[in-house]
Swiss-Prot record:
Gene, per the UniProt record: rbsD
EC number: 5.4.99.62
Places the protein is found: Cytoplasm
Record keywords, A-Z: Carbohydrate metabolism, Cytoplasm, Isomerase
GO molecular-function terms, A-Z: D-ribose pyranase activity; intramolecular lyase activity; monosaccharide binding
SUPFAM superfamilies for the chain: RbsD-like (SSF102546)
The name this protein goes by in its record: D-ribose pyranase
Function, in words: Catalyzes the interconversion of beta-pyran and beta-furan forms of D-ribose.
Source taxonomy: Bacteria, Thermotogati, Thermotogota, Thermotogae, Thermotogales
InterPro entries registered for this protein in UniProt: D-ribose_pyranase, RbsD-like_sf, RbsD_FucU
PANTHER family reported for this sequence: D-RIBOSE PYRANASE (PTHR37831:SF1)
Record GO biological process: D-ribose catabolic process
Family (UniProt): Belongs to the RbsD / FucU family. RbsD subfamily.
């Protein structure tokens, strides 16, 4: 049995298979995941698990060079935005942050290698993690 890092075998596999610039979408409980997309639905209750706790564990294993957020998060959910940016910055201070309109975010997410649905129940609690390289 694995002791540390991502213990969910499907998420662990998704991260292990990512290459440079591949994307992984970590989304809230209401996000429209495309039919046929590879997904892990972690929701057990409203708010559980939260976006930040899921991202925190994934960052232990995934090298991230950029995150993509919906620009609507700036007005509708600045608390989560700030906590997320701080969390990602602790792991890598050079991470780029890109804001796009929510409709564009949904289009971009369709090219993700996978989706992880959290129990996040705050508006626009979604992030796309863009994989970096370790060399």
């Amino acid at each position: 049995m694995k002791r540390v890092g991502i213990l969910n075998s499907t998420i662990s596999e998704m991260v292990a298979n990512m290459g440079h610039t591949d994307m992984l979408a970590i989304v809230d409980m209401g996000f429209p995941i495309p039919d046929g997309a590879k997904k892990v639905d972690l929701v057990v209750d409203k708010g559980k698990p939260g976006l930040l706790e899921v991202v925190e564990v994934i960052l232990k294993e995934l090298e991230v060079e950029k995150i993509i957020l919906a620009e609507e998060m700036n007005e509708k959910n600045p608390e989560t935005r700030d906590l997320l940016i701080n969390l990602v910055g602790k792991n890598n201070s050079n991470v780029k942050i890109e804001f796009v309109p929510h409709e564009e975010f949904k289009k971009i997410s369709r090219t993700s290698k996978g989706f992880v649905r959290t129990g996040a129940d705050r508006p626009y609690s979604n992030v796309i993690l863009v994989s970096g390289v370790i060399f």
